[in-house]
């Protein structure tokens, strides 16, 4: 079944104890969801933990096998390999824009076309956003391999190796046919079954036995692990392939490793002894332009260390500017024999290697390296692990895949950077064998750490099954977001910029420099208005990387780049980056990120209203969750500078900033004029946070200044925007000004995440916040697509989506998860889960966009920007649940509290 709670866990909320497990579990705790029933519902079928009809297993409906696999967990995303998604959407294109919006953006379109032509045809570079060549729909992706920042290789749910990010930030969406697992079964010295574990029917390697029957196999993903179960018809054998990647919260070493492990558990359900072999074949390179120059070669290796022997092949790919070595390896034991074929032609029929395996279940293992390839020639290799399998027995065959690309250059080829893992394994480009050995020795410990982290959530019966899948599987983007994690040399931190930030050097030098893309199609590192949403995952799981990112943003804030360029939306010529404003992004991987920021050139974001505010809010949130006083002290001058820059947007001095009559915030296609619910709310929240930070920093004059602004701004916000049911989109005279914006409570969301926003620290009247959230649920959720697709960005008061812009009638998945967190914070837990559930089921179960969650989709036909950063905001839901439980626990009598593990307070309350 798909994302379904086991029957033993289908119990009502009223029957559950309220308790919390607070041991160190890597950023997650078991929580008991309260108020999970709809007021209209009395039966248990509406509780989040109940396995309702939508969990009936449509993705598994084609499965005809009986095998359930070896130790496959009950929760996650599960799909039969024969499944076909009925709905086939297309990426958003110009022809999806309404005529009225097309007219509005005609000038921008012409400017973009001219810029695009120069970029692609003259400069021979790829645009940071390519509106003419969107990534097409491919409903194939599964869990990526590889830790954080060392590159990733995505393996599809049907077993194909199909999405590659080895060159930093640059993606190749290509299925490499030669990259396969093959099973060979032998009885009484004779091969009785040999099959490529793939549904493909390719035009190459035609001597191989392709076309696996997908009706007897399924895939199950719970990132960073995945399981594929194959029931081999007529053989009484079940294969379970477990894929493991070292994504380990609060671990800053193994989490950086460019490795993946495949553990094959083979179960013999028959009465005869079997000899079983699994062969792992891999092409050297992807078969594209990178390989065309030739010079690729393979060689065998064997590494014996600490009682463990690992044997396999090294695939050397010396193509500049980022050469690498891939290692395919298996563990050799007393019960497991490892053999190999150094080289075969992946574009041939493949007969030689197929017959080699067929003959005796092993490979010939020739000595020496292969001859380097000629121009246009390809080469592949294979590693085979073999074992004897007793009747009713089980054996385990262990493989690893590692890639060593220690030194990288971005597209401008201006600087050499060293990946994080080189700190632990060296940077000479010869550590692929050591990485393989380490992975095969350590993966059991990784799995223990993963289980300790995930089990408190998975074991919580009050949480819905879809949420358990979404919470962990959406984390794929932290590694597969074009992510880089780099070492920071001592001489790369200018003294004049970092001198006043005392923790800058130790943070960046101890924990490195972190960057992830806005999206795989929106190629800008650390896009800050979007990171605002996604950052919850980073600060909860790898807080030092969040602090590192914040220090980088602080450094960039004080820099300027006065190079003038034409902005595409307005046509205005203005500098790339002005001093004392937060940059939109840290740069394009096809250029030189960190050195040249603000790859985004649609708007001049120096005049955006949300970036500075989001920095202030995240600084305090990060301080509150980490308790790092030194960080807050370092960031305080930066917060003062960016808030001073923001003051100019309050033109009438009423304590509330005004938007500028264009799309001057993260909704960069949705015009906002005057005081607005979104930016005005963020402003008031940031002002409130400045008051709190001023108290902590002992700055009485600053405290008084922002307290006065807050008092005036609150009054103006309520007077200008509150209409009795919700906050108006903005205060202009335009028809869309009364639209119901799903993201109108973003400021309150962050305040609550920081332990503020109620009681003495209330900014927005609680009754108004709750009323607005109920209105959003009624109109943006329930009145949109039957309540089954999440919350539309904008809804008119009479229940029709706002189509005044290309973004107002979209659903933004990351915004919906943030909205759901806000609902949970305000006690609307059932509504929050119901709202978020619509997005999960739409993306993962209906549209087939697993492990490529888009920024946006419309009610029909289109999606936009696959594999996007913002949906990581689902971790804000987890934080809201944990804080809800903490609050409940703290309200108990002292004698009751004493029986539960103590909870650390978030954020010191005294002055620094």
From Swiss-Prot:
It is a peripheral membrane protein. It comes from Rattus norvegicus (Rat). The lineage of its organism: Eukaryota, Metazoa, Chordata, Craniata, Vertebrata. This is Non-lysosomal glucosylceramidase. It holds the Pfam family Glyco_hydr_116N. Keywords: Cholesterol metabolism, Endoplasmic reticulum, Glycosidase, Glycosyltransferase, Golgi apparatus, Hydrolase, Lipid metabolism, Membrane, Sphingolipid metabolism, Steroid metabolism, Sterol metabolism, Transferase. Non-lysosomal glucosylceramidase that catalyzes the hydrolysis of glucosylceramides/GlcCers (such as beta-D-glucosyl-(1<->1')-N-acylsphing-4-enine) to free glucose and ceramides (such as N-acylsphing-4-enine). GlcCers are membrane glycosphingolipids that have a wide intracellular distribution. They are the main precursors of more complex glycosphingolipids that play a role in cellular growth, differentiation, adhesion, signaling, cytoskeletal dynamics and membrane properties. Coiled coil: none annotated. The keyword Lipid metabolism applies. Its EC number is 3.2.1.45, 2.4.1.-, 3.2.1.-, 3.2.1.46. GO terms for molecular function: beta-glucosidase activity; galactosylceramidase activity; glucosylceramidase activity; glucosyltransferase activity; steryl-beta-glucosidase activity. The gene is Gba2. Gene3D superfamilies: 1.50.10.10. It comes from the Eukaryota. Enzymatic activity is dependent on membrane association and requires the presence of lipids.
